[in-house]
Amino acid sequence: MDNDHLTTLNLGPTHPATHGVFQNILKMDGERIVDAVPTVGYIHRAFEKIAERRAFYQITTLTDRMNYCSAPLNNMGWHMTVEKLAGIELPKRVEYMRVVIMELSRIADHLICNSILGVDAGAFTGFLYIMQSREQIYEIFEEICGARLTTNMGRIGGFERDFNDIAMRKIDKFLADYPAVLTEFENLFNRNRIFMDRTIGTGGITAERALNYGFTGPNLRAAGVDYDVRVTSPYSSYQDFDFTIPIGINGDTYDRFMVRNKEMWESLSIIRQAMEKIKALPKGVFHAEVPDFYLPPKEDVYSQMEALIYHFKIVMGETEIPKGEVYHSIEGANGELGYYLVSDGGRTPYRLHFRRPCFIYYQAYPEMIKGQLISDAVVTMSSLNLIAGEMDA
């Protein structure tokens, strides 16, 4: 085709549909996309390099700011990586507490992804309904750790404090309220003729191409591949829970939407099971016995020399991790979120690499939107749940 007849269009970097600082230079034949060149790095913050100068516990503030829609998931994946290298084993109750927080984070992430997809397709009502439930989740986080979005939640070895009675009641209330909200949300979209026309056949990718790119998570399962890190490589006692892995068929925008909806139902089931297990165990256990990593209670710091020593050691970043290297991955809200850690036996990582699923999806994005309409490019990006903080890191 003669390029003289094509129009160059910038989608981003500050377009309201990009959900972050993305730029795509599109070649358009009318409203049809002929070619796309993505640009990355607008909010690259050199997290991996910064981590080489930080104590292990301080890196939580970096992982918090990758996929900020489900920050506790990122944090706990990092904590598990350090625990794996340091040989720290957690009590079952702590594992179950982590599962509750991780699945609440997954729901918060999925609901914002699917509701924003609705907004980009022209349906604003579902967003207004379901955001009330996101607020409930953030109130739970706030009760547990004092923060809502970038929570700094969790510690190497467990949690900074136990779930109090208010937090437990709020979790139970969310479990009681959310099914009706999710059902109403699905009724607005699942069989909506306009929404189906906008999403079915849009932004599709085959299972083979998805695997070649390195897709994982809901975007891979939407293409029909039954892969979930929680099942293939269980961590944090996920083997103790009964749940199914929803999969799609066509790998298009509609399938990605449906897979995330079904995953929220499964997450609710997992949280219910975890809460039953937590309530069956004695209260007060919320971290492993690892004084080198866990800050002692403040009243002990004022009265006991040993507690003061550990407090000083941790705050000054003098805790050392055994020499070695380890890779650990979790099923993040967007897919396999991996951490490759190399330690030279010092107080900071020698090298740290994050496997960021959004970065991988963005490489496939131009292929997925070629031949599509400009409006299809917007809903395709929404359905991939591309988060700039995770992609650029």
UniProtKB/Swiss-Prot annotation:
Gene Ontology molecular function, alphabetical: NAD binding; NADH:ubiquinone reductase (non-electrogenic) activity; quinone binding
One Pfam family linked to the record: Complex1_49kDa
EC number(s) given by UniProt: 7.1.1.-
Bilayer topology term: Peripheral membrane protein
Broad class of where this protein is predominantly found: membrane
Top enzyme class: translocase
The family this protein is said to belong to: Belongs to the complex I 49 kDa subunit family.
Name of this protein: NADH-quinone oxidoreductase subunit D 2
